[in-house]
Curated annotation (Swiss-Prot):
GO biological process, one term: DNA-templated transcription termination
Cysteine pairings via disulfide bonds: none
Gene: OPG124
UniProt KW Heme keyword: no
Gene Ontology CC: one annotated term: virion component
The protein's name: mRNA-capping enzyme regulatory subunit OPG124
Function: Acts with RNA polymerase to initiate transcription from late gene promoters.
Length: 287
C-alpha cells in the first residue's frame, strides 16, 4: 500500500531498452489486436472495478470526481523538466524542440452523459476514458510524419492496456535509442494514460519504418483517414520486453484499482452523501 501511495504522489517511470533491429512490420488499418492475459493480467482485475464505475450515472460521477479531477498538466511539466521551449503539434510549426501528439481525452472522464446501468451484464460499451484499448489509433505514429531534426518525440498515450500499445512501444524502441514512459503526479490518477518521451533518433530504422507505412497508406504525408485502430506486428514481441513494459504499467494499474475502489465505495456509501470516509481518503490521496 505504501508503494501505491508513493507512486501516486511522486509519479513513476521506466526506461525501455533499445533494439537495433526493427521487428517485422505488417501494418493493417481498421482493427486493433484483441486483449490477452500475456499483455497484462492486472488489467483484468482492474477492469472489474472500471465496470462498476461504468455502470454509475454520469451526473453522479461528475459529483464525486469534481474535486479530484484536477487539470492534467503532465505534458507541461515534461516540457519544463526537459527545457522544451517550442513544440510542434501535427505540423503546425516548422521549427521546434519536440514533436508532440496527445491521444488522451485530456481533462475528461466519460464519453457521453448517461443514466445508471442495471448490471454489468447490461454493459455494451466502455463509456469511460479508462482502460479502453480502442482509444489507441494510428495517430500514435503521426509525429513521425512531421519529425525532422527535433530533439524529442513525445506522445500522450490514452491507455497502457492491450497488445497494441506494447507493439507500438516496441517499434519506438527501435526508432529511438532512448524511450521512457512516465505517469506523472500531474496526470489524472483516475485514468490509465501516460507519456512516452523518445530521443536520439535511429534514422536507419525510422526511414525503414516510414517507407513501410507510406507504401501501405499510399501517401507520403499524413491523412486524417488514418485516425483509426490498427495492428502492425504479426508476431508477438519478446517476453523480456513485455515484462519490462508491465513493470511500469502494473504499478499504474495497481494504483488505479486502489483509487477506483475508494471512489466506488464512496459512491455506494451508506451515508448517501459525498461527505463520507471513503471520499475523504480519496481527496487526501489525490490532492
Amino acid at each position: 500500500m505504501d508503494e501505491i501511495v508513493k507512486n501516486i504522489r511522486e509519479g513513476t517511470h521506466v526506461l525501455l531498452p533499445f533494439y537495433e533491429t526493427l521487428p517485422e512490420l505488417n501494418l493493417s488499418l481498421g482493427k486493433s489486436p484483441l486483449p490477452s492475459l500475456e499483455y497484462g493480467a492486472n488489467y483484468f482485475l482492474q477492469i472489474s472495478r472500471v465496470n462498476d464505475l461504468n455502470r454509475m450515472p454520469t451526473d453522479m460521477l461528475k459529483l464525486f470526481t469534481h474535486d479530484i479531477m484536477l487539470p492534467e498538466s503532465d505534458l507541461d511539466k515534461v516540457y519544463e523538466i526537459l527545457k522544451i521551449n517550442s513544440v510542434k503539434y501535427y505540423g503546425r510549426s516548422t521549427r521546434a524542440d519536440a514533436v508532440v501528439a496527445d491521444l488522451s481525452a485530456r481533462n475528461k472522464l466519460f464519453k457521453r452523459e448517461r443514466d445508471a446501468i442495471k448490471s454489468n451484464n447490461h454493459l455494451t460499451e466502455n463509456n469511460l476514458y479508462i482502460s479502453d484499448y480502442k482509444m489507441l489509433t494510428f495517430d500514435v505514429f503521426r509525429p513521425l510524419f512531421d519529425f525532422v531534426n527535433e530533439k524529442y518525440c513525445i506522445i500522450k498515450l490514452p491507455t497502457l492496456f492491450g497488445r497494441g500499445v506494447i507493439d507500438t512501444m516496441r517499434i519506438y524502441c527501435s526508432l529511438f535509442k532512448n524511450v521512457r514512459l512516465l505517469k506523472c503526479v500531474s496526470d489524472s490518477w483516475l485514468k490509465d494514460s501516460a507519456i512516452m518521451v523518445a530521443s536520439d533518433v535511429y534514422k536507419k530504422n525510422l526511414d525503414l519504418f516510414m517507407s513501410h507505412v507510406k507504401s501501405v497508406t499510399k501517401s507520403s504525408s499524413w491523412k486524417d483517414v488514418n485516425t483509426v485502430q490498427f495492428s502492425i506486428l504479426n508476431d508477438p514481441v519478446d517476453t523480456e520486453f513485455i515484462n519490462k513494459f508491465l513493470e511500469f504499467s502494473n504499478r499504474v494499474y495497481e494504483a488505479l484499482y486502489y483509487v477506483h475502489s475508494l471512489l466506488y465505495s464512496s459512491m455506494t456509501s451508506d451515508s448517501k452523501s459525498i461527505e463520507n470516509k471513503h471520499q475523504r481518503r480519496l481527496v487526501k490521496l489525490l490532492l
